[in-house]
């Protein structure tokens, strides 16, 4: 078992509270810092608080190797064990000998080289995203019904990988009253050239209709946006899995 806190959209999680629970019950922490490269808590980089930290170098992240990511290890011994399993768990024989199940998680030298080059501009990328947040803060300061998600205190230092807003449930976008229903009925999904169409709206944990209305309204003005992640326990594929929730994620969605 493990605790996996997430730096959602770059925002640091409540490090002190999570670590206190982990220490009390002896549960290892594996940080999901996929979106948190460059974010800090009390001046310390995310991904370095837990036993392991996970970074993503996907094409849309703060820096990229075109795909893949990195695992932050606590020491050399842990790194050697991880690399053993990441390179197919091949034993030290002149032929292929496998006594344990391994995986092919190696990153090519070409992708790694791209990542090394990206490191030279990492600070500039973080600064640019923070500048974008400053711009949104200025533009939204007098807009009623919209709250920009910002650092809750000086201890938090988000990279603002993506900027997020919370909409007042009473907010209405003129002319977009049926945006959600219309979008779902015409939506397509998939990847790699394989697509499928949605048939109807989901009845379980539908997003606030204002969210889709705002997205469509912004799209008409050439501004890209998207809904918050759907709560994982509300994904149909996980419907039979146990979940301990308090309603916050559903209300935000």
Where are these regions (language model features)?
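PLP-dependent aminotransferase class I/II
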Residues: 2-6, 11, 15-17, 24, ...
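Active-site phosphate-binding strand-loop segment of PLP-dependent enzymes
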Residues: 1-65, 70-72, 77
């Amino acid at each position: 078992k493990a605790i996996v806190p997430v730096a959602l959209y770059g925002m640091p999680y409540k490090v002190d509270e999570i670590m206190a629970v982990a220490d009390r019950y002896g549960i290892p922490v594996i940080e999901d810092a996929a979106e948190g490269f460059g974010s800090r808590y009390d001046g310390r980089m995310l991904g370095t608080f837990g036993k392991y930290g996970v970074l993503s170098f996907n094409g849309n992240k703060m820096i990229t190797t075109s795909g893949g990511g990195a695992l932050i290890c606590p020491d050399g011994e842990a790194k050697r064990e991880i690399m053993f399993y990441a390179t197919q768990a091949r034993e030290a024989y002149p032929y292929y000998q496998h006594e344990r199940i391994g995986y092919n998680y190696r990153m090519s030298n070409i992708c790694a080289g791209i990542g090394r080059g990206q490191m030279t501009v990492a600070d500039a990328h973080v600064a640019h995203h923070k500048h974008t947040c400053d711009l949104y803060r200025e533009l939204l300061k007098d807009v009623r019904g919209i709250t920009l998600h910002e650092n809750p205190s000086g201890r938090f230092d988000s990279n603002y990988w993506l900027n997020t807003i919370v909409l007042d449930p009473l907010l209405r976008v003129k002319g977009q009253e049926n945006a959600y229903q219309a979008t779902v009925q015409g939506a397509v999904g998939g990847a790699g050239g394989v697509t499928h169409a949605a048939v109807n709206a989901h009845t379980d944990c539908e997003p606030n209709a204002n969210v889709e209305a705002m997205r469509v309204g912004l799209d008409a003005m050439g501004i890209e946006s998207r809904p918050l992640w759907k709560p994982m326990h509300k994904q149909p594929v996980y419907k039979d899995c146990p979940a301990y929730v308090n309603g916050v994620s559903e209300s935000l969605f």
